[in-house]
Amino acid sequence: MSTRAFKNAALCLAPILTIGTLISASALAADPLGSLVGSTALGKQLKEDYGVKVYGWAQAGLIYNNNSTDDVSKQAFFNTDEGFNLNQFALGIQRSPASNVQGRIGPFPGPMPQEADWGFNVTTVYGKDARYFKTYGWDEDLGVNRDNKPEDEAFTIAQAYLEFYFPVLGGSDLMLGIFHTPLENEIGFALPSPAPTDFYSHTYSFMHGPAKHAGALYSFKLPSAPGESMLGFEVGVVQGWNNLQSENHDPHVIANVRWRSADFGTWVDWENIYGNGGGDSFANCACGSPMPAGTEDDTAQRYETYLTISHQLDPANRIAVETSYGKQKNGALAGFANKTDATWYGANFNFHHKLSENLSWNSRAEWFYTDAPVHVVMANIDSRTGIPDPSWGSFYAVTTNLSWLPIPNLRLRPEARYDIHSGPGRDAFGDGSRDAQLVLSFDATVFF
């Protein structure tokens, strides 16, 4: 990428940095999410009288790689192109029920609220990342997206759900609608801490999981005495991966277990999803499941599981280990490895060190393996011919960054990531010319 191109891209970031400064100067709320509208008379009334918060964030970044192509996939996921990327411009409105258990997060300490309550969430996202939040049968055919190329910005209604709290068992939460997946250590939205969004790029295990679901998710906490550890469970029935309209008409089942230590410093999360993936991937809209398998009339069972253990060592240091395993029957790309089914698994280790109140250092190491190609991002599909030339085998990645919040509403993050691919098929990086690649990035996120 040329110096001139970097200067032009830096000019694109300038408005985001300026907006962050203005928002922080005018915002009165301690929470950066909702601070812009929350500082107005209307926002205060919505929050105080109805418990409703209007919030948003804007994320953009610059990316550079060490080869002659502009291809920064797969290790820069969500990003694919070198240069400037408007990743996410999101707007949301929500009301959270008073509860001691939160769907997708788990149980919390404290007494169980004795009254039922309700809430809702609607989150819209525009940008390069939004294409990964499209839901087949919901927002893939919106007019604003209809003529888009796969690499273009998209608009999605990423979440639209109702939420109900019931004072049963140790506390229960029911979500109905379209919501971000409860699986994986990382999440796709560029939210502020303490959300697990410490890196600009994402892991291979995150890439190989679902982004969102349409259906129902029931979460509950077992009764526990003050000072005891907490145990929660989640059970869900959804329309597969990233689908509202299931072509094979077979629901997927989610089953998760979440344990929290009494001091809330250690978390254990075991997350699972199982169902028929036959015909649930759609090339014409680049949506649905990213793992094509058979047709809607086929049975192509898909299973994925994640186990994440995180621990707060002390006020300044936190670690997390995630392992994952998945299997796709009758994978459409598995034949390139002379297989019928595809299996993938891996592990990643995360270390987070707080240097000061507004500066942290984050590092991550990952190993990931696929015995056959399964994911469309790894398929390297020729845009002219539609013919895949996939990569598979072992992937090794090391990522490190600094996350700085000069003001509560603005996160600045320089990041370096180095990946190595060892395996058959096409070299994974540099448009098929490299088996290793260095990616440097800088992203800015404004919370409002």
Question: Which residues does each PLM region occupy?
Answer:
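Outer-membrane beta-barrel pore domains
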Residues: 75-78, 133, 145-150, 262-448
